[in-house]
Amino acid sequence: MNYRRFGRTGWMVSELGYGMWGLASWTGSSDAESRQSLQRAVDLGCNFFDTAWHYGSGHSEQLLGELVRRNPGRKLYLATKIPPKNFAWPARPEFSLDDCFPPEHIEQYVRASVVNLGLESVDLIQFHSWSDTWLEDDRWVKKINDLRQQGLFQAVGISINRWEPRNGTRAVMSGLIDSVQVMYNVFDQNPEDELFPACTAQDVGVIARCPLDQGSLTGTLTLASKWPEGDWRNKHFNRATLKASVERANALKALVPPGMTLAQMALRFILNSPIVSTTIPGMRKVKNVEENLQIAGQGPLPGDLYRELRKHRWDRQAAR
């Protein structure tokens, strides 16, 4: 496993982290299987784990706390997120700080996450939605500073709205945050335009989320793909989105080198960017952990392949 510096925190985190959304929020998840997958990741050198209170109303956090206690001799970096008070994603321009992150709500969920983890402190607390308009209201800054001084967490970050990396650039340049979590993959390259240069300038850690584009960059989706009733993917992959995603993923398959999967190629594309501190694929099964972490230490993709993949940028806008 290779380790990268997590911005100004100085933490050395595994370039391949672990996204825990699917362990408590997706249909078909099993705690026993999740525990095995998490432990296998630790055994293979993964030391960065990203969860959130919203993932199973704290259940994903509880699984992560168990993992830490099973590995007392290893330093694992834990990142979790405060849900917006209105539980509405993405943050809309008309949402005020009181709608999403009033000070008392911030404190309530920071403390709830620490309790769920069963620890005295968490490494990174993130806002699970974000709007740069909230920079005008310093109440969140005062509350965050107060809770950090109490030792409840070490660093603070923001999770930026899907396909809106610009709506976080001001927060980065303010110097108030230590990290950003943003969609970045073969398709979603727009963080490179403004956000990544700002992160470089301010020495802010970068967490690349959705590295496999919610599953489309695994190459396993088809036009007939369906999910159980109530699964969030039914809404995300509506007919038009599924068709476009499958077509774009299929166009990449001819580029996959021998001995590599589409998912592995997609992950290595992300790691070609030196500003990325870690990327956090979701890995519910041990076989997924082993396949994804197999690329650790393999270095950047060949230049000609990387340049070809860059042509597959897909600029999208979230529906409002």
Briefly describe each language-model feature range.
Residues 57, 129-320:
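Beta/alpha (TIM)-barrel catalytic core signal, keyed to glycine-rich beta->alpha loops juxtaposed to Asp/Glu
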